[in-house]
């Protein structure tokens, strides 16, 4: 998905199932809250407001990102109506898991990177890339290095050495390159991932 399209999908979730948010809450301080039930949302850590604006006949309204409990009230068909595509079934099941306690978000917040990565990939719909995104952006494990289509292209174009990696299986090629190239940054590989992603997108004038 393109970045604008992803924004549209997130906004659809917020406006459909999030709670209205006062602009004073966005500008003021937020206290920590229960990640399962509380709204407005603030990521896994619950340390700040996450809100999206929706244009209405009376101007702009702000909506929180829905908590798992709020989103679990949506049926699978209702989620599909938001044009989430194949993601709808994953979102539906993960919200059910979070509300039931099978997916323990509070426990996840206490885990180290390796433990969190293994825990997340044990749930339906969460692969290694998404788990690494959660670890990097939601849990602040800055050693996490998500590899999506864009990052894979960058790795192959800028860091792939045919002679060095000629015997490396394709299934672990990107992981091997990441370890060799970015393992030298002392657990900050995720920071470097953001730099190379931004640079490549900016160089190709595709940031939006």
Residue ranges and their predicted role:
Residues 1-208:
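HhH-family (HhH-GPD) DNA N-glycosylase catalytic core used in base-excision repair
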């Amino acid at each position: 998905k393109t970045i604008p399209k992803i924004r549209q999908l997130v906004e659809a979730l917020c406006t459909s199932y999030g709670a209205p948010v006062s602009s004073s809450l966005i500008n003021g301080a937020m206290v920590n809250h229960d990640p399962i039930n509380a709204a407005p949302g603030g990521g896994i850590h619950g340390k700040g407001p996450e809100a999206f604006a929706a244009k209405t006949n009376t101007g702009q309204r702000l909506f929180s990102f829905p908590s798992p409990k709020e989103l679990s009230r949506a049926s699978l068909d209702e989620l599909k109506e938001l044009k989430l595509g194949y993601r709808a079934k994953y979102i539906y099941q993960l919200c059910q898991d979070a509300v039931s306690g099978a997916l323990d978000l509070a426990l996840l917040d206490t885990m180290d990177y390796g433990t969190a990565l293994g825990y997340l990939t044990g749930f339906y719909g969460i692969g290694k890339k998404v788990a690494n995104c959660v670890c990097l952006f939601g849990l602040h494990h800055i050693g996490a290095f998500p590899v999506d289509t864009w990052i894979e292209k960058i790795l192959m174009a800028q860091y792939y050495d045919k002679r060095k990696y000629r015997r490396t299986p394709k299934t672990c090629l990107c992981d091997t390159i990441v370890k060799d190239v970015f393992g030298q940054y002392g657990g900050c590989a995720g920071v470097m991932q953001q730099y190379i992603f931004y640079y490549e997108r900016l160089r190709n004038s595709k940031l939006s």
